[in-house]
Swiss-Prot record:
In the reaction, the free carboxyl group of octanoic acid is attached via an amide linkage to the epsilon-amino group of a specific lysine residue of lipoyl domains of lipoate-dependent enzymes. It catalyses: octanoyl-[ACP] + L-lysyl-[protein] = N(6)-octanoyl-L-lysyl-[protein] + holo-[ACP] + H(+). It comes from the Bacteria. It holds the Pfam family LplA-B_cat. Gene3D superfamilies: Bira Bifunctional Protein, Domain 2. One of its GO terms (cellular component) is cytoplasm. Catalyzes the transfer of endogenously produced octanoic acid from octanoyl-acyl-carrier-protein onto the lipoyl domains of lipoate-dependent enzymes. Lipoyl-ACP can also act as a substrate although octanoyl-ACP is likely to be the physiological substrate. This is Octanoyltransferase. Substrate binds at residues 71-78, 146-148, 159-161. The record marks 143 as: Lowers pKa of active site Cys. The gene is lipB. SUPFAM superfamilies: Class II aaRS and biotin synthetases. It is found in: Cytoplasm. Residues 33-216 form the BPL/LPL catalytic domain.
Length: 233
């Protein structure tokens, strides 16, 4: 069984470094058998974080601070209106990090289906995507959820960031996830009404429990799928 813990939403958002310390402490407890598998759900105040694959050209050019972290992937933004999930779970043997990423994607795709949002995977790119339009009107993939994870001693850290009702100006200062030929979107933009992280939590909870309690068997997703290249944002 997976425990879902909501630690701070909206005005009670949790600073990134504080949440990272909580992750590390819980990770140590799960590794040692002192705690069960847990997903932490929260919002952060506005912050940029950079995974191990971040390139210099991905970063803000104006010197805006960026927190470098030990997850996969490249640079991304967290902030108000975005639901962040940190699954601290023990993976089965044989270790398969990509399968873990797929399970997270499955849960998010199922949640979006509950909201009548059609979402999917993109070959070679992790995360969850929605079909959108570029400024010139041409169709393009737009990321609604980013994923970046780390595994140590068979226990995961970091996780997903799901855009619910956030603004998009912070993305203009970076190359989100190092991807230049796609956009970003949110649930609220996709369905034309405001859907906050607090609205999403009760809908997402059962999908996370089901996906992460599946003992390593990737759940069938509810939307068109393609392969995931790796555990990155």
């Amino acid at each position: 069984m997976v425990d879902i813990v909501v630690t701070g939403l909206s005005a009670n958002s949790v600073p990134y470094i504080e949440a990272l310390e909580r992750q590390r402490a819980l990770h140590a407890d799960v590794v040692a058998g002192r705690a069960q598998d847990t997903v932490i759900l929260l919002e952060h105040p506005s912050v940029y974080t950079a995974g191990r694959r971040t390139e210099p050209e991905d970063r803000p050019r104006d010197g805006t601070p960026v927190i470098d972290v030990d997850r996969g992937g490249r640079i991304t933004w967290h902030g108000p209106g975005q639901l962040v999930g940190y699954p601290i779970v023990r993976l089965p043997e044989p270790l398969d990090v990509v399968a873990h990423v797929r399970r997270l994607e499955d849960a998010l795709i199922a949640l979006l289906a509950d909201l009548d949002v059609a979402s999917y995977r993109v070959d070679g790119r992790s995360g969850v995507w929605i079909r959108g339009a570029a400024p010139d009107g041409s169709p393009r993939d737009e990321k609604v959820a980013a994923i970046g994870v780390r595994v140590a001693e068979r226990v995961t850290m970091h996780g997903f960031a799901l855009n619910c009702s956030n603004a998009f100006d912070a993305y203009d200062r970076i190359v989100p996830c190092g991807i230049r030929d796609a956009g970003v979107t949110s649930i609220s933009r996709a369905i034309g009404r405001t859907v906050t992280p607090a609205d999403v939590v009760p809908l997402l909870r059962p999908h996370l429990v089901r996906a992460l309690s599946s003992n390593g068997s990737a759940m069938p997703a509810t939307a068109p799928l393609s392969s995931v290249a790796g555990a990155r944002a």
